[in-house]
Swiss-Prot record:
The gene is ddl. It comes from Tropheryma whipplei (strain Twist). Binds 2 magnesium or manganese ions per subunit. ATP binds at residues 171-226. GO terms for biological process: cell wall organization; peptidoglycan biosynthetic process; regulation of cell shape. Mg(2+) 1 binds at residues 296, 308. Pathway: Cell wall biogenesis; peptidoglycan biosynthesis. Belongs to the D-alanine--D-alanine ligase family. Pfam families: Dala_Dala_lig_C, Dala_Dala_lig_N. It catalyses: 2 D-alanine + ATP = D-alanyl-D-alanine + ADP + phosphate + H(+). Residues 138-339 form the ATP-grasp domain. Keywords: ATP-binding, Cell shape, Cell wall biogenesis/degradation, Cytoplasm, Ligase, Magnesium, Manganese, Metal-binding, Nucleotide-binding, Peptidoglycan synthesis. It comes from the Bacteria. The keyword Cell membrane does not apply. This is D-alanine--D-alanine ligase.
């Protein structure tokens, strides 16, 4: 029996999404894995969870069963210290950091696990950090010859000192409409579609409430498509392109992703998408991703333009990633990810 330590929750705004992903995984994981659920509260406390609530978008609560990580590298064993002072040890083979957003998919938890020499599922420190920071994603991918949208970076600490200068430079460089988003947030938190100049300052302030810096880029009148990638027996497998039909907002926001009904169109029926698998694979390898990821593109008249890379895509029942592989059940998608990571552990 293989033992999987499942990390979920976390300190980011995507805490509840991580919770829902963990709940879905627990319901569908195959019997050859024993799962050790370790939740991270919104305050950053690691707690051992003997059960996970059936609430779809729940919250990790401090139940008094605190988790103590190993004090030496290479030890795959946690200590659970109970509220009354008693403790016990739990061994594991592999960690799955099923975390979204900052302190989860930005390289921080990956760095902790690397320091402890603990094997884990998903991309390492560099790929996680580079993919989470949209500014550096654009720099790295544009240098690799992958088309990206032009962008303007506003660092939070400089915004209030040079507000008028930033606004002038943006209006000189771009034509409206624009799209403003935090540089390091996920699930569309802090994103705003900006039609007019007067809306721009508020949109930037909103983005900076959700991230350390903000990105401004053209708001394309172009469909967004999604390509999921998974390593299967050492071979990178690309899904068909997915288009999401949704109503309401002008972009695929949090409500559309997790709360409102949507329709997945697989494969997406658009011209100018030839070679998408090669482009997605190039992005995956350029950043050094591993095991699984999701690459998001805009479909323009001249072809695909990279939007974002997600090294820890949502694994809820409503998420794009597990739905992308039409020939695979949810449980097969999870098993393929775990098998890819476990094979590397056993080498």
């Amino acid at each position: 029996m293989r033992r999987l330590l499942l990390l979920f929750g976390g300190r980011s705004q995507e805490h509840s999404v991580s919770y829902a992903s963990a709940r879905a995984l627990l319901e569908h994981i195959c019997d050859e894995w024993t799962v050790i659920p370790v939740g991270i509260t919104k305050h950053g406390d690691f707690v051992y969870c003997s059960t996970v609530s059936e609430q779809d978008y729940g919250e990790v609560i401090d139940n008094g069963n605190r988790v103590v990580w190993p004090s030496r590298a290479g030890c795959k064993k946690i200590e659970v210290v109970q509220a009354r002072g008693k403790s016990f040890f739990v061994e594991f083979d592999l960690v799955f950091p099923l975390l979204h957003g900052v302190f989860g998919e930005d390289g921080t938890i990956q760095g902790m696990l690397d320091l402890l020499d603990i094997p884990y599922v998903g991309s390492g420190v560099f790929a996680s950090a580079a993919a989470m920071d949209k500014h550096y994603t654009k720099i790295l991918c544009s240098h690799a010859g992958i088309p990206v949208l032009p962008w303007y970076l506003i660092k939070g600490h400089a915004w209030h000192k040079n507000r008028d200068s930033f606004l002038k430079q943006i209006s000189d460089r771009f034509t409206f409409p624009l799209f403003v988003k935090p540089v390091d947030a996920g699930s569309s938190f802090g994103c705003t579609f900006v039609d007019f100049f007067e809306q721009l300052p508020v949109a930037i302030e909103h983005a900076l409430q959700h991230g350390k810096s903000a990105i401004v880029e053209p708001a394309l009148d172009a469909p967004e498509v999604f390509c999921s990638l998974i390593e299967n027996n050492g071979v990178l497998q690309c899904s068909e392109l997915v288009f999401v039909k949704h109503s309401g907002s002008k972009f695929y926001d949090y409500s559309a992703k997790y709360l409102n009904p949507v329709e997945f169109v697989i494969p997406a029926q658009f011209d100018n998408t030839d070679g998408y698998a090669e482009i997605a694979s190039k992005v995956f390898f350029e950043l050094g991703c591993r095991h699984y990821a999701r690459i998001d593109f805009f479909v323009t008249e001249s072809g695909l333009v990279l939007n974002e890379i997600n090294t820890s895509p949502g694994l809820t029942q409503k998420s794009i990633f597990p739905s992308s592989f039409k020939s695979m059940q949810y449980s097969q998608v999870i098993e393929t990810i775990l098998a890819s990571a476990y094979c590397q552990v056993k080498r």
